[in-house]
């Protein structure tokens, strides 16, 4: 087993144990920052639909504290590309080839103002350990 695979397994186990300790207030610093920096215009926020004991971003969207917030979820394409399409609370989601939920009806894709990026861990140099697909790394390198 490669080192990254071992780390993914280790940190997934840790995240699973800590998942139920996360409170709604977890997002308060982010809410304050967004409201302070973007109070005059709409904010295009990309996120992920939570799965596998990830921080429940749905709680953030339901708070209503962020004014003029537009949510965009990733959609994965056949060529290993990822794009972000708008999603509203009652919009239909479909399961993609990796078992993740993504918008079923696609809007124009956008480059988000702010991105919430899933991760398993990060190190002292702020290197992110994701799930190994490289989608976010490719997206960030492109944009």
Residue ranges and their predicted role:
Residues 83-143:
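Conserved phosphate- and dinucleotide-binding cores of soluble alpha/beta proteins
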């Amino acid at each position: 087993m490669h080192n990254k695979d071992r780390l993914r397994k280790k940190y997934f186990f840790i995240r699973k144990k800590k998942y139920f300790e996360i409170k709604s207030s977890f997002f308060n610093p982010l809410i304050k920052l967004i409201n302070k920096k973007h109070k005059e215009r709409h904010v295009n926020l990309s996120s992920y639909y939570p799965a596998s004991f990830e921080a429940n971003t749905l709680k953030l969207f339901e708070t209503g504290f962020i004014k003029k917030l537009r949510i965009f979820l990733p959609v994965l394409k056949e060529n290993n590309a990822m794009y972000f399409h708008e999603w509203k609370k009652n919009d239909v989601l479909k399961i993609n080839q990796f078992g993740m939920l993504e918008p079923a009806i696609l809007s124009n894709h956008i480059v988000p103002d702010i991105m919430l990026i899933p991760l398993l861990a990060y190190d002292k140099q702020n290197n992110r350990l994701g799930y190994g697909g490289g989608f976010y790394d490719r997206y960030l390198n492109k944009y």
